[in-house]
Amino acid sequence: MRIGEIETNSPVILAPMAGVTNMPFRVLCREIEQELTGTASGLYVCEMITARAMVERNEKTMHMTTFADVERPRSMQLYTVDPKYTYEAVRMIVDEDIADHIDMNFGCPVPKVTRRGGGSAIPYKRRLYGNIVRAAVAATEGTDIPVTVKFRIGIDDDHHTHLDAGRIAAEEGAAAVALHARTAAQRYSGSARWDEIARLVEHMDGTDVPVIGNGDIFAAEDAARMMAQTGCHGVEVGRGCLGRPWLFAQLGAQLRGEDVPPEPTLGQVARIIYRHAELLAQHDGEDHACRDIRKHTGWYLRGFPVGGEFRKQLAQVTSLTQLQALLDTIADSTELADNADDARGRQGSPSKVALPEGWLDDPEDETVPEGAEIENNGG
């Protein structure tokens, strides 16, 4: 897949997920893909970075922009609502050589974001959305750094925006667009509507801007099926990789026509869990690593017959030594997980999208929403 001047051996992208796709997880995914297939071939995108917090050099935000030496190309996603901060943040990325690819987030459906006019609420305001994309592209002028854009089908079924969002992004110079095939109202519930990806692909015909599909990819076969059904040029995977960092090796192999690596045994997963914790400790210290790995162990052990007491003990680890001792008890297990490629992560149910008062009155309004920048929490 080609995005601007970036060419990858696999059309697979790791979707940014807060609290998950930090440097340790990205490095782990790359290591496993390299080990199983001989290449680290896709794009691994960092956690969403708030443009304003970056411009203000918030300490936590700047730490989140850290990339490992092995990460090439370095891929960063920005959350922004204001063309001014967008331009300044992207210029900062360019001038300080922070990343090689910039993705713009217009897909977040979280109520605390949309009720202020951010995230998946933005594409409804066509001019504002276009101004933001234009600012990002302008800030990369004279470089090889491509700007890509991610959005949803729309706010709800009465307010679809993805076709306009794709065309506007192309007109403003975006190098690719990605569609999460759900509305903001759906959040993560129900099934992704791949037919809308196909509609966007058709709508973008003639622009030379590739379309990346996102939604309900939990197994290697899913990615191949999405690309065949929709004609999309690449796939983006989020929740499917929770506790399954080897999924990228499987996806890449499937799409290249190679033998797909099998699901790992419980013993192999134990070694992956420890490596993940080790990378977390190197990045953020052992105390933080032992707290952070707890949520991951629930995902890693899904479908394995390990029992509630073992899971409870893992959730209480306070040192890498303690974690290693627990994992040693399952290190020789050849058990395989049941239903390993079932849906995982957030699902919930659809709900009305929280929006600022009068937000839907004028889709051409380009006023920057007040207070829509997420607080400086690194989000």
Would you name each region that the model predicts?
Residues 1-8, 12-13, 18, 24, ...:
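Alpha/beta catalytic cores of nucleotide-metabolism and tRNA/nucleoside-modifying enzymes
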Residues 2, 17-96:
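Glycine-rich, positively charged N-terminal anion/phosphate-binding segment
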Residues 11-21, 73-86, 122-123, 149-162:
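Active-site mouth loops of central-metabolism enzymes
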Residues 12-15, 44-46, 74-78, 100-102, ...:
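Hydrophobic faces of well-ordered beta-strands that scaffold small-molecule active sites
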Residues 17-19, 49-51, 79-81, 107-109, ...:
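Active-site beta-loop-alpha junctions enriched in small/polar residues
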Residues 35-39, 87-118, 122, 126-210:
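Alpha/beta enzyme core
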Residues 57-61, 125, 179, 244, ...:
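Short, solvent-exposed helix-helix connector turns and helix-capping sites enriched
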